[in-house]
Amino acid sequence: MVSFGGLARKIFGSSNDRRVKTLRQRAEQITALEKNYENLTDEQLQAKTAEFRAALAEGKSLDSLLPDAFATAREAAKRVLGMRPFDVQLIGGMVLHERGIAEMRTGEGKTLMATLPVYLNALEGKGVHVVTVNDYLATRDAETMGRLYNFLGLTVGVIKHGLDDDERRAAYACDITYGTNNELGFDYLRDNMKYERAQMVQRPHNYAIVDEVDSILIDEARTPLIISGPLEDRSDFYNLIDTFIPPLAEEDYEVDEKQKTAIFTEVGTEKVEKLLEAAGHLKGESLYDIENVAVVHHLNNALRAHKLFQRDKDYIVRNDEIVIIDEFTGRMMPGRRYSEGLHQALEAKEHVTIQPENQTLASITFQNYFRMYNKLSGMTGTAATEAEEFGNIYGLEVLEIPTNLPVQRIDEDDEVYRTVEEKYRAIVRDIRASHEKGQPILVGTTSIEKSEQLAERLRREGIKGFQVLNARYHEQEAYIIAQAGVPGAVTIATNMAGRGTDIQLGGNLEMRVRQELSDVPEGSEREEKIAAIKADIAQLKEKALAAGGLYVLATERHESRRIDNQLRGRSGRQGDPGRSKFFLSLQDDLMRIFGSDRMDGMLQKLGLKEDEAIVHPWINKALEKAQKKVEARNFEIRKNLLKYDDVMNDQRKVIFEQRLEMMDEEDLTETVAEMRHEVIEDMVILRIPKDAYAEKWDIAGLKQDIASKLNLDLPVEEWAKEEDIAEEEFENRIKEAADKAAAEKAERFGPQIMTYVEKSVIMQSLDNLWREHLVNLDHLRSVVGFRGYAQRDPLNEYKTEAFELFQTMLANLREVVISQLMRVEIVGEAPPEPQLPPMAGLHIDGTTGENDFDEAIWAEHQHDDRIVPPAQRDPADPRTWGKVSRNEPCPCGSGKKYKHCHGAFE
């Protein structure tokens, strides 16, 4: 039965189809200009950039220039890169220009498509950022596409790890800047820790195109970028806590894999209480007394480290370090650390060096970083499943771009086995059969551990020549993937999301040339060898096509349909044939966590024998339903986290804007006076409450506050004795005295130095208090969730208390700044330190440690008028001895050293 919605779509087409149809008409208009542009000389084509910029200066819009700018970029791509963007790429380019997300299948040319809107938007000169997932892709795309932009007179920069500030500033000043999401985010945070505008590297955030947009804006949305500084070393404590976990029995804790939580049961709590008491780390009577909050936090981290985090799946141990593995891509993330002590708990678990805990100095999530851009767009092979999230959080519409050629890949139904062992036996059989007929195979696994287990099985079965691609061998990644389309190739890979390199049937020409001809100079010999490699690849491609194209064999389903679709999408690029199939077992994580018990019982009733699979579209639908549930739950988590982060983000914006204003101010006299007056008002209202009787006034406290905060000694006791004096009069007199002292100081310092001092004190104080405030917000966030049990909305509680903390921070800022400015003085140059006398060479007795002193000491110190020659000293009168060295024999004649005799009394 066809639903009404389905029937309407058949008659009128979906909204996606209608939108594509409109854009296709515009693409045809651009194609109609192609002949005109083909007739232009290189110089005429290059002159178009200046022509477009002049039109923009006269008030024309980018939209009005789009057809000609796209036609220019297309023609330049043909001449410089030897590639012509298809009409579907023009459609994708328009989506990117119009703040959308272009979902484009793998191999359809996303990188080339992006050049069209990049060129158009770079004409404004405000900067365009092309964001990729790793340094390799950023550098590769900047080099390849940079030739096109340079031809058209635009500058291109690349931001990657290891650049200094000058190099970064130059790259951001370019018309087009390629870089990774991490580098861009960290540069923003670092800029907001600088003290002068000239030190900053980024320009205002104008336009960004995010490649693999789902990976960056969804998968990594929960991961904040944090710049931190080390705290004290507590490695002994982490190691102690870690010893408590391995002896625990299953009854001592509960693990919820769905929610990814681990907690102690009542029995377990009693056990760890006894262990803590024995170790002297339990305060009070119960583990849950307020004094033990930090200990409970560390215990929970240790339990999570042991029971929720698996080595070679969630992290690997390399060079005495814990390196996190991206759960979506299988990539290592060196330098990335879990916060709040979890990373240290993992280090203790694996017995590697425990790095000190860090204090957050600055942080931001990708969600809030990318929402700062005036214009944001993205491209990916898979985004439709997350269209709701892109719309709700980023205001981005997802448009599926049709393929240039029809997709010929066959997506087979999943094969489900009862046990993991049966599943792997079936996988090995299938790999052997496909390998023997020369079909290239890409095997997708969900973890390093599983990819290596499968590799070991293939070795035992005598299948040779396979490649393993996972986080351990990140460096060879691009080359391995580039050759995965060669006939008979078997490539085992952890999740392929965001890999960024196409698998071309027959092999990748560019990669082979780079690998095989790196030492062959330009010339006829090199050209001949390139022609030979081309012919070889063409031959290999024919063989791969004859064998059925690339076979994507997945060993497990991921929580996200999008990751599964990305893996499938590696096959069948640009109209090539191919096939994909998922092999599952009821013991797989997704099946086990989401109700495989019912399915297991049903399969047993059906009489499923060992090594027999069930294949049915119903299974696929059931799995898709489970995945949708997980995706919906993860979306809710991200949405909820964003609501909390938005509170911090609003405060972050206020602080960062204040810092920028401070950098630009040339005279801070009024700002500081305002802060000083507010401090005085707060001081007076605290000690002399409004309308309170004089007996209730705390005059002694007020005098102390004036001394500590304003560095003034004012006769407030005398003022208090005056008749009819009110709090306003106190305020006015204190303000007058403080303003006078500040004005005198400004007169002594001079305006330039005073402004510099004020700026330095305000910004340093602001940074220190902001860091403390971030810690307070983290603590508030960790406890506010429990308010839900008291029927109070945790988010509203967080908003209210975070605002109060912010107000307190600003009040503290005023006090700290004014207190320091009222005390600061210019210190004259310190006198040069006196030169030490040359050391005298003394003979030391090796057996007694005594030295030949007497006259040598005198010779050494004769410049000092406090030294009296030994012959002039009266043993009975210490006043005649002058200055005596501590190691000199005591002048009293005891035979002891001075330090052990009369010198002991000094």
UniProtKB/Swiss-Prot annotation:
Family: Belongs to the SecA family.
Reactions this protein catalyses: ATP + H2O + cellular proteinSide 1 = ADP + phosphate + cellular proteinSide 2
HAMAP family attached to this UniProt entry: SecA
Xref: Gene3D superfamilies: 3.10.450.50, Helical scaffold and wing domains of SecA, P-loop containing nucleotide triphosphate hydrolases, SecA, preprotein cross-linking domain
Residues given in the record as ATP binding sites: 89, 107-111, 502
Originating organism: Brucella suis biovar 1 (strain 1330)
Gene Ontology cellular component terms for the protein in this record: cell envelope Sec protein transport complex; cytosol; plasma membrane
Binding site for Zn(2+): 890, 892, 901-902
Topological category with respect to the lipid bilayer: Peripheral membrane protein
EC top class named in words: translocase
Record InterPro entries: Helicase_ATP-bd, Helicase_C-like, P-loop_NTPase, SEC_C_motif, SecA, SecA_CS, SecA_DEAD, SecA_motor_DEAD
Cofactor: Zn(2+)
Cofactor, how bound (note): May bind 1 zinc ion per subunit.
Record key words, sorted: ATP-binding, Cell inner membrane, Cell membrane, Cytoplasm, Membrane, Metal-binding, Nucleotide-binding, Protein transport, Translocase, Translocation, Transport, Zinc
Protein name from the UniProt record: Protein translocase subunit SecA
SMART domains registered for this protein in UniProt: SecA_DEAD (SM00957), SecA_PP_bind (SM00958)
Annotated compartments: Cell inner membrane; Cytoplasm
SUPFAM superfamilies in the cross-refs: Helical scaffold and wing domains of SecA (SSF81886), P-loop containing nucleoside triphosphate hydrolases (SSF52540), Pre-protein crosslinking domain of SecA (SSF81767)
Protein function: Part of the Sec protein translocase complex. Interacts with the SecYEG preprotein conducting channel. Has a central role in coupling the hydrolysis of ATP to the transfer of proteins into and across the cell membrane, serving both as a receptor for the preprotein-SecB complex and as an ATP-driven molecular motor driving the stepwise translocation of polypeptide chains across the membrane.
Subunit architecture: Monomer and homodimer. Part of the essential Sec protein translocation apparatus which comprises SecA, SecYEG and auxiliary proteins SecDF-YajC and YidC.
